[in-house]
Amino acid sequence: MIIEDRIKAFEKLGDFLMDFCNENPNSNHLLETIIKSSSSYNGWFTSSNIRSSISAICNNLRSAKLSSWLSSYSIPIEAKKNVSIIMAGNIPLVGFNDFLCVLMSGHRAIIKLSSKDNRLFIPIIEELIKIEPRFKDDVKLVEKVENFDAVIATGSNESFKHFEYYFKNYPTLLRKSRTSVAILTGEESLDESCLLYTSPSPRD
């Protein structure tokens, strides 16, 4: 699949997600149902929190943005690699960018979802494959990480130590816990100050 076809597919996925965020009556009802029940399996995942994450994702899935981003890289045409993605679950769909990067680079995404966020991705992956069926063989959800060529893993500091040990013989991109601060100017509205304060993310 050429890069232009991948860009078109993800742009259409962005349109699908935008319709959902705009509450289009023709949008995916399964995704709506999952969001409404999300707090029962992860109390941090409120409906507004999830919709905010989805909105941020679909805003970046524009053809111009994707083309500009990819133009900075030389993507070689070579045999596909199986890239295992071990996703975190601190923010809704936090592993989407890793998923996007793997598929855009022409490789296969072997995904192990976090137990804290193991529902939202499914209807999104199904929609992407519906848009572009050639992705069907390039996306696989797994419970056990095996049969891979490289690893992208995100987790706690303790998980990071395990990742380093278990994947020491493979190409890896490993992430552990981070902390950050926000700088306020004093001109923020109350709504802006409160926005996205919740969830166990690096900004808290």
Where are these regions (language model features)?
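Residue-level marker of positions within ordered structural domains that often coincide
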Residues: 11, 189, 203
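Active-site catalytic microenvironments for nucleophilic, acid-base chemistry
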Residues: 16, 127, 131, 201
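Conserved small/polar residues in nucleotide/adenosyl-binding loops
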Residues: 197-204
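Generic recognition of cysteine residues
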Residues: 21, 58, 101, 194-197
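N-terminal Rossmann-like NAD(P)+-binding subdomain of aldehyde/semialdehyde dehydrogenases
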Residues: 1-84
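Sparse, context-dependent recognition of short Cys/His-centered cofactor- or disulfide-binding micro-motifs
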Residues: 35, 42, 46, 92, ...
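Rossmann-like NAD(P) dinucleotide-binding subdomain of oxidoreductase/dehydrogenase enzymes
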Residues: 66-195
